[in-house]
């Protein structure tokens, strides 16, 4: 896991995108023009959760080092210390990949 000095607020999640495969299972190279935008990422940092109507904090089900699948066009791309990250809202996370 990367040691990053970025602490997400509320229900925000900082992830590092897992690069898509560049070859198929049979060994064919996939050209850049045919690659889909990756939707799998590793969680780097998680905010404390948002507050409900009663003022109580709702913690997130996601934790650091989880591998998640996120909405294709969700989040904000950021670059920190030369590394690219994506800052997502909890609602942009579609699933946790269990390995």
UniProtKB/Swiss-Prot annotation:
Source taxon at top rank: Bacteria
Matching SMART domains: Cpn10
Molecular function as annotated in GO: ATP binding; metal ion binding; protein folding chaperone; protein-folding chaperone binding; unfolded protein binding
Function: Together with the chaperonin GroEL, plays an essential role in assisting protein folding. The GroEL-GroES system forms a nano-cage that allows encapsulation of the non-native substrate proteins and provides a physical environment optimized to promote and accelerate protein folding. GroES binds to the apical surface of the GroEL ring, thereby capping the opening of the GroEL channel.
Key word ATP-binding present: no
Alphabetical list of PANTHER family matching this protein: 10 KDA HEAT SHOCK PROTEIN, CO-CHAPERONIN GROES
GO biological process, one term: chaperone cofactor-dependent protein refolding
The name this protein goes by in its record: Co-chaperonin GroES
Protein family (similarity comment): Belongs to the GroES chaperonin family.
Record key words, sorted: Chaperone, Cytoplasm
